[in-house]
Amino acid sequence: MSEVKIGKNESLDAALRRFKRICQKSGVLSEARRREHYEKPSVRRKKKSEAARKRRWH
C-alpha cells in the first residue's frame, strides 16, 4: 500500500503529485487494470508472446 505523509509546509497538491508518482512507479494502477477481469492462461500466454514479438521488431 502506498502511503504519503504531508509535511508541515507541503501543499496538498504537492503531496498528491508525490502519491501519484509513487503509485505509478510501484505499478499499482496497471496491476489493478490487468486484474480487473479474469484472463484465461491461454490468452495470457498469447498476449505475452505478442508483446515479445512487438519488442523484437520495434
Swiss-Prot record:
Keyword Ribosomal protein appears in the UniProt entry: yes
**Which residues does the annotated region (Disordered) include?**
32-58
What does the entry give for GO biological process? translation
Q: What is this protein called?
A: Small ribosomal subunit protein bS21
UniProt superkingdom: Bacteria
Q: Name one GO molecular function term.
A: structural constituent of ribosome
One cellular-component annotation, GO: ribonucleoprotein complex
Per UniProt, which keywords does this protein have? Ribonucleoprotein, Ribosomal protein
| Family the entry assigns | Belongs to the bacterial ribosomal protein bS21 family.
The encoding gene is rpsU
Question: Which intervals carry biased composition (Basic and acidic residues)?
Answer: 32-42
Biased composition regions of type Basic residues, renumbered to the chain? 43-58
Record's HAMAP family? Answer: Ribosomal_bS21 (MF_00358)
Name of one Pfam family that matches: Ribosomal_S21
